[in-house]
Amino acid sequence: MGRGGLETMLMNYYRHIDRSKVQFDFLTHREFDGDYDKEIIDLGGNVYHLSNLNPLSTSYKKSLNEFIESHPEYKIVHSHLDCMAGIPLKYAKLNNVPLRIAHAHNSNQTKDLKYPLKLFYKRNIKKNANYLFACGDEAGKWMFNTDKFKVLNNAIDAKDYTFNMNIRNDKRKEFGISDDSIMVGHVGRFFPQKNHEFLIDIFNQLHKYHPNSYLMLVGEGELKTSIQDKVKALGLEDNVIFTGLRSDVNELLQAMDVFLFPSLYEGLPVSIIEAQSAGLPCLISDKVPIECKKTDLVYQLSLEDSVNTWADKIHELSHIIRRDTYEEIKQSGFDIVENAKWLENFYVDLYKKALGEE
């Protein structure tokens, strides 16, 4: 299983749930091992692989059905495929899996050639799910066209992100960033949704004002090469750091001065919760649900605003003094411990119901 935002959220829950009561197995749509596979196996789970999701492929649907049919021990199937969440739930229903959860993670989708197909399958989710979850209100209402769903917070282990000046100094030294430099950061997959093209345009403008500024991009994805080409064409290659996938995101956030997130759409991004937990000012687009604001560190601009406006705001936010926000994150309901306990109890109660023990 890869190291994206959704996968990170699932691992946060998996690490903190009582695995003597609830165990997770993961079915992924990639035919190769991912970053989290070894940890999942070490924690007692299994990782199974299918080919890329293709609802029009007879062989794909056959493989999916055969997998579920071969695992009658599963009484709960929890699907995290957004618009396509109903597809595995359809075969779970056909194979008499009693508890089928669809989970919404986005408040829209990329409007590409697949968009009409996604909307078609979105309409069929509720036919096959008997429980609806969402990462936030906007995501749930968009995905399910109802307000009858449970919001499960994209919770994190907030203590791991608490601002630490020593870590900040060490990480900036590691990347050769001086104390007087502005370090802008972003964590996210190189995918159209994350709007890296505009992000680079914003940084390019900031760099004209502040030549001693840097941009750190954490992640991988299909658009990484084209973004690297754009950075090179703008002459910014010495000031843009591509870290790739990292297991120390909590420490990288300490090194940043402003977290930039100009997405085209989102559900409730866990990366914004992580950034706030690190006491990091966040500048987000008006397409990111404002419900992600759990502290006074989140600021919003329109995607229609100029790159000058965005660059000016980054400069302003870079002067904010960092602080410990752990209690604020905990009080907002986004610390993982209580959330994992709730999910554990939910699964156990459902399982008992499925076995007729209640």
What do these predicted regions represent?
Residues 1-62, 222-223, 346:
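N-terminal strand-loop element at the rim of the active site
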Residues 64, 162-177:
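A short helix/loop element that forms part of the nucleotide-sugar donor recognition site in Leloir-type
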Residues 79-85, 104:
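Short His-centered aromatic/hydrophobic patch
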Residues 127-167, 300:
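Donor nucleotide-sugar binding/catalytic pocket of nucleotide-sugar-dependent glycosyltransferases
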Residues 4-12, 182, 186-205, 222-229:
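A conserved mid-protein helix/loop that constitutes part of the nucleotide-sugar donor-binding site
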Residues 245, 264:
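Aromatic "clamp/platform" in nucleotide-sugar-dependent glycosyltransferases that forms part
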Residues 27-28, 272, 281-285, 290:
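Short hydrophobic beta-strand element within catalytic cores of glycosyltransferases
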